[in-house]
Amino acid sequence: MFQLPHKLDVYITNVCNLTCDQCNRFNNHDFRGWQRWSDYEAQYQQWANVIKIPAVTIMGGEPFLNPTLPDWVTGISKLFDVDVQILTNGTRFRQAGGLYDALLNVRSGQIKNHIAVSLHRSDQFEKLKEDILWFLKAPVEILTSTHENNHHNSDWCFRDSNDIVVNVYIKDHFHTAAIRPFTRIGQPMQKTYLLHNSDPFFAHQNCGFAIFKSYHFVHAKLYKCGPVALMPEFDQQHTLAISSQDRTLLNSYLPLTVDNFDQYHEEFFENLDKPIAQCKFCPTLETITVKKIFPLIKGQQHVL
């Protein structure tokens, strides 16, 4: 059994209902596709036989838009005997059928699955608060960031009568993403997408995925980060404006799988925290900017 020192991110959908500029997994664009738990359950069962994980975050996209989210929570919790955090933008609590029961029913021992909300606009907190209170079971305790019992260091911690927890974190700025959209002159409705052309060493040095060791399970395959997993899939849907040589490089990354684990896992983990050739497609410190998020709901014109 191989012990991973850090949590893993389990990515289950490209789909998001918001258009947050500079989303680092490109979900602000028309990025489609989601993963059904039953399609990957057997592979994750095999993973549970070879690795041990300290914690898991289920994310997207917007994971609440994956109709099998309760199955993911139940399945990952039971297979890996681990705490599961669900990372959401907080706009879909009233459409989360079956999720509360999944959070409640899979608990055993020290496992306490919970929800984390990345709140992109602090002026939306009161609306979010109403939705969270609707989702949880009264009475609900609300702790601020300075409360001694807020062990998650969140801006607000909601804990209900069944000890189900929703943490809210204000996240209203994003850094420059790998994919750069632009509109061709004379073709205002046709978007084209570019990647960066950086020194891989310097891109990796300032990469949030690398700094916070955000390793990703996508389609039951383990990747160094989200972009290296998702850029080829985005390219399939939108055809990035890159050279054939760069496209070959983009698709050359070898993830760790249950099938190649025995032959490849030592090399994979030994190099996991080192730059890879595909880092060239991400920004460096010189090209990174920080932008305040003003998310729109997709298909609507008003700010969230």
Where are these regions (language model features)?
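Polar/charged alpha-helical tracts
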Residues: 38-45, 49, 78, 101-105, ...
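Conserved AdoMet/S-adenosylmethionine-binding subsite of the radical SAM
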Residues: 66-213
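Accessory C-terminal segments flanking Radical SAM cores
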Residues: 183-304
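Short catalytic/ligand-binding loop motif for oxyanion handling, primarily in non-cytosolic enzymes
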Residues: 30-31, 65-67, 94-95, 123-127, ...
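Short, surface-exposed linear patches
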Residues: 33-34, 44-45, 79-81, 95, ...
